[in-house]
């Protein structure tokens, strides 16, 4: 089924969680703001996960546990809880905004990496 409002900027891929039970994607909400949405691989209606006041600015990735999704929001690295949609920031604002390329979790989920100002950055996730 086609959904109006699907976005391809920032660069975007549909991503399935590690358990294979949810597919995440970026789509505009009723206010035109780019949000994370989830849908079952079996189909059904998509569920809006995030309710941010500003656009998600990057591609995203699933935490290895499937409990979090990482992305750039408000020029900061953020994670959204995969059930509640609650967003937590992992970084403060930097001089250069993070790249719109996907943030990447380490295999154990304890670290998150991203590009910013032509350099590789990492932070602990506490997850």
Model-derived segments and spans:
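Conserved hydrophobic/aromatic positions in well-ordered beta-strands
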Residues: 37-39, 78, 121-123
């Amino acid at each position: 089924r086609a959904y109006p409002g699907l976005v391809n900027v920032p660069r975007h891929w549909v991503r399935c969680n590690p358990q294979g039970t949810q597919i995440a994607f970026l789509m505009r909400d009723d206010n035109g703001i780019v949000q994370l949405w989830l849908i079952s691989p079996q189909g059904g209606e998509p569920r809006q996960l995030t309710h941010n006041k500003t656009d998600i600015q990057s591609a995203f990735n699933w935490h290895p546990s499937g409990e979090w999704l990482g992305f750039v929001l408000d020029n900061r690295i953020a994670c959204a809880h995969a059930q509640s949609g609650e967003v937590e920031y992992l970084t403060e604002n930097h001089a250069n905004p993070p790249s719109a390329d996907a943030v990447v979790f380490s295999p154990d989920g304890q670290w998150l990496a991203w590009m910013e100002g032509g350099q590789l950055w990492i932070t602990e996730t506490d997850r």
